[in-house]
Amino acid sequence: MITIRDVARQAGVSVATVSRVLNNSTLVSADTREAVMKAVSELDYRPNANAQALATQVSDTIGVVVMDVSDAFFGALVKAVDLVAQQHQKYVLIGNSYHEAEKERHAIEVLIRQRCNALIVHSKALSDDELAQFMDNIPGMVLINRVVPGYAHRCVCLDNLSGARMATRMLLNNGHQRIGYLSSSHGIEDDAMRKAGWMSALKEQDIIPPESWIGAGTPDMPGGEAAMVELLGRNLQLTAVFAYNDNMAAGALTALKDNGIAIPLHLSIIGFDDIPIARYTDPQLTTVRYPIASMAKLATELALQGAAGNIDPRASHCFMPTLVRRHSVATRQNAAAITNSTNQAM
């Protein structure tokens, strides 16, 4: 996909100059205009008309794209965006992508048509190239929980690898070795990084986890319950589980209780995100805190700066997760022996 950067490179000018030509600015010489339009023709570049319309307009709305605003994680993200928006006397428009590339693309385009010149986008389905083209045309577009090469200053991310290592090391430090992983079936980068962190921490202790230690499901409570049942059915004698997120961990707790397995007496479990449900499960869930509210607030400020042309191109924005200790983890050597009936369930 040809971007405005490709046109600038071909014409031997800056991206800003190409933008001025495409927006019919009078601050461009005839020769420069001719060189840019020649490059546009040769590369068959087609600028986004909606994006061009935004270039010279000020909007009182901020757009935000999330997977599903009904999910507590994304609800917290949107609330944080709205808090910053209100401070700037702006309103928030929301688009849901539901984990689908076409809906993700459509949500962004609709918000552009609504004249949102500041966009906070949680994108997992679109390619780097397509996102780069949107970002080339929308200076106020910022990505959250993803980094597109060349646009790190407009991306706010989390170190998922470190968070997963942190969770797994806590279980290892409590005497656990047979540690399963509840994986998201959506196949996104977050899951790949958390799985890699889990494997990395185990390998530090010379433990090579087999594929059978991984149960997959949708990243929600029903998915976590199904993935945990899958692991239990393999009779693996796991003593601990690290879940992709808190929703999956909560679902896993239901499956474990249904099978007579007491948490953390017989099996320990750790989640990821620290959404409100983690404080209200029984037992309360030990988890890795994802500072989504802080990340969303920063992303919104960056989007507003970008829309105003004031963003720092040298900056980077990567957050570190933290461990939240509650009551779903116990030291393995102090754990109660699993009864015959429970052992059969496992």
Curated annotation (Swiss-Prot):
Designated name of the protein: HTH-type transcriptional regulator GalS
CDD domains in UniProt: HTH_LacI, PBP1_GalS-like
InterPro entries: HTH_LacI, LacI/GalR-like_sensor, Lambda_DNA-bd_dom_sf, Peripla_BP_I
Lineage: Bacteria, Pseudomonadati, Pseudomonadota, Gammaproteobacteria, Enterobacterales
A single GO BP: regulation of DNA-templated transcription
Residue span, HTH lacI-type domain: 1-56
Record keyword Cell division present: no
One GO molecular-function entry: DNA-binding transcription factor activity
Task of the protein: Repressor of the mgl operon. Binds galactose and D-fucose as inducers. GalS binds to an operator DNA sequence within its own coding sequence (corresponding to residues 15 to 20).
Subunit and partners: Homodimer.
UniProt keyword Transcription regulation, yes or no: yes
Annotated DNA-binding residue span(s): 4-23
Record keywords: DNA-binding, Repressor, Transcription, Transcription regulation
